[in-house]
Amino acid sequence: MVVEVEGFYGVYLLFCTNPKYKGRIYIGFTVNPERRIQQHNGGKHKGGAWKTSGRGPWDMVLIVHGFPNDIAALRFEWAWQHPHVSRRLTHVPRKTKKQSSFDFHLLVLCHMLRVAPWNRLPLTLRWLRQEYRRELPLLLQPPLHMPLAFGQVRARPIPKGEKEKGRLGENRAEETEQEVILLGDAVVQRCRVCYERVQDKDDSLHCFHPGCTLTAHIMCLAKLFLLNEPQNLIPVEGLCPSCGHSLLWGDLIRHRNGCYGDLEEISSSQAHWGDELHRCSD
């Protein structure tokens, strides 16, 4: 089964199966995994990287996805490629002679998912090829909010008009249309947390549970979710101040950005995340 994800940003690991170069790995960033592996195996003239050109075939073994934007994903890619240069990973031991490049970079990945800023992001670690799967060290398991997934993933573009719809809030859309009819241009939305007027729709979040009309400033809702952990900048989850349902921060951001394809599945199983608010630092 292929899982489709809207607003896709991922960082992947390739494994070389060419007998001449077998065991070599490559780490890269993509917004379209299916297209990217074809480019790598097609060579430079097909858009592949020069480091992988002429050394295929390559298998795309695993991918980390759920980044809020390309900048966050690219910074993650760089740190994974250069663990001993990144100030976030100075504690990671260097590769031993007995370690394969694949096992070493998997170990680096385990460390990365447990340190700031990445340990607060709503990431998914997905094994794309079952035959390469490794058991992660017991003491280096990802945070509980980061699921381990299996199987292929496909990037799906956000449909036109859905992004605007998401920022307004699906439940608020019909209500606001009625307000426009009744009040003309005098449509006023107030934050459910601070009760101040919401001036900019780009600065607001909306609950996606049916019947809930929550509107709140991003910062107000973030601070509410972080009341018990003020040392952090990025919330993981919290209770909707309007309907009382548990909300994953990443789901709220994906909903705001117009991603609806996997929200129904997420809200019921809590198996996938999406996040924003704070741009990752390297």
From Swiss-Prot:
GO terms, biological process: double-strand break repair via homologous recombination
GO cellular component: Slx1-Slx4 complex
Stretches of the chain forming a coiled coil according to its record: none
Residues making up the signal peptide according to the UniProt record: none
Entry EC no(s): 3.1.-.-
Keywords: DNA damage, DNA recombination, DNA repair, Endonuclease, Hydrolase, Metal-binding, Nuclease, Nucleus, Zinc, Zinc-finger
Xref: InterPro entries: GIY-YIG_endonuc, GIY-YIG_endonuc_sf, Slx1, SLX1_C, SLX1_endonuclease, Znf_RING/FYVE/PHD
Subcellular location: Nucleus
Cofactor: a divalent metal cation
Major location (coarse): nucleus
Zn-finger segments (SLX1-type): 191-243
Residue intervals of the GIY-YIG domain: 7-97
GO molecular function terms noted in the UniProt entry: 5'-flap endonuclease activity; crossover junction DNA endonuclease activity; zinc ion binding
CDD domains found in the cross-reference section: GIY-YIG_SLX1
Top-level taxon in the UniProt lineage: Eukaryota
Family the entry assigns: Belongs to the SLX1 family.
Primary role: Catalytic subunit of the slx1-slx4 structure-specific endonuclease that resolves DNA secondary structures generated during DNA repair and recombination. Has endonuclease activity towards branched DNA substrates, introducing single-strand cuts in duplex DNA close to junctions with ss-DNA.
Cited HAMAP family: Endonuc_su_Slx1
Summary of subunit composition and partner proteins: Forms a heterodimer with slx4.
Protein name listed in UniProt: Structure-specific endonuclease subunit slx1
Organism: Xenopus laevis
Gene designation per UniProt: slx1a
